[in-house]
Amino acid sequence: MSDFQKSFSESTSSIKFDEKYIDNSVQPNDIGVAEQWAVKTVADPCVGNLATPVNSGYFTKAFINNLPFYREGISPNFRGLETGAAFGYLLYGPFTMTGPLRNSEFALTAGLLAAIGAVHILTALLVLYNAPGKAPNVQPPDATVNNPPKDLFTRAGWADFTSGFWLGGCGGSVFAWLLVGTLHLDTIMPIIKNIWTAG
């Protein structure tokens, strides 16, 4: 330690700052905006579910809580219908455009049948989740979903969700098939089909 440092360490007088440079509005426990971004435990720290800016932010909570699975005020059957319609509608395109019959005149119908088959497989998985011997797991409230639907996590509620999912999935696939079949896509379809066959 140098002599200069020793003189400061051995001095007993505290360092005085000019009063005009001291901000008295800031307290030692005041962390300001950082408190909004702090990572906190939701309930039990042993669970491992932390409230972060990502999973407890306004946009994330609004988006997740507006999905049909968590939206308040709708029945389990309608939850399944809406979820299944989205799945069926979105499954139709990949099966039609990348399926083995994509270059034939039966591509649209083959895509429809494949999408309905996939919806049947997903419905079978939902039925197995509600298999005898165990009840569906009830989701506890967490940082993202404050009020999970209680009526969905019963045997009857899950069965209603599953039947709605099947009907919505088949209906969504048929709706996509009708849209593609009735729109004038004769000029666009060959271009899209050649993207996957080139090479």
From Swiss-Prot:
The keyword Transmembrane applies. It is found in: Cellular thylakoid membrane. GO terms for cellular component: photosystem I reaction center; plasma membrane-derived thylakoid membrane. InterPro entries: PSI_PsaL, PSI_PsaL_sf, PSI_suXI. It comes from the Bacteria. Disulfide bonds: none annotated. NCBIfam families: PRK00704.1-1, PRK00704.1-5. This is Photosystem I reaction center subunit XI. It comes from Prochlorococcus marinus (strain AS9601). The lineage of its organism: Bacteria, Bacillati, Cyanobacteriota, Cyanophyceae, Synechococcales. The gene is psaL.
